[in-house]
Amino acid sequence: MVNYPHKLSSQKRQTSLSQPKNFANRGMSFEKMINATNDYYLSQGLAVIHKKPTPIQIVRVDYPQRSRAKIVEAYFRQASTTDYSGVYNGYYIDFEAKETKQKRAIPMKNFHPHQIQHMEQVLAQQGICFVLLHFSSQQETYLLPALDLIRFYHQDKGQKSMPLGYIREYGYEIKAGAFPQIPYLNVIKEHLLGGKTR
């Protein structure tokens, strides 16, 4: 398609540039990368890991016909546990994914008490639990074991954010790839299931 200069297309460009920013899908690119990675793992028979649906509170339903209900008003509830769960090589896996534009830390307000409690319960049952942290400004991704997140959460309750230095010390950097895009199973296999120690 050739774009010839004329008023209509320049007007369209101006209106699209002046639209207010919508932050509703912030982090979606990271989420899409994780979903693509999970699809790859599933297609290769390596793991079965899925994103948990966000609970919705239905407020109002219209019934235009007896057989057709139409949800008119609904709201997202706060997620009750973590983002992803599944099975890898006989092990239960449960993890949260967080993305930030900050360069030196991840805000602790992103982690809710019920999520920390859920991670503690998963670890008590010998499950593999962690958080994937993505620093979008540096394009760096880390796997931080839940135990290290929980320790930081309980010891440093006054902290507003977890420093990148702590994440680098206790976490594992994941280099992005083509297939899979975020090869976190490599870290699990090598570091969390009896491979190399820190």
Curated annotation (Swiss-Prot):
Pfam family, one: RecU
Names of required cofactors: Mg(2+)
Ranges annotated as biased composition (Polar residues): 11-22
An example molecular function term from Gene Ontology annotations: nucleic acid binding
Family according to the record: Belongs to the RecU family.
Record NCBIfam families: PRK02234.1-1, PRK02234.1-5, recU
Name this polypeptide is given: Holliday junction resolvase RecU
Protein species of origin: Streptococcus pneumoniae (strain Hungary19A-6)
Gene name as annotated: recU
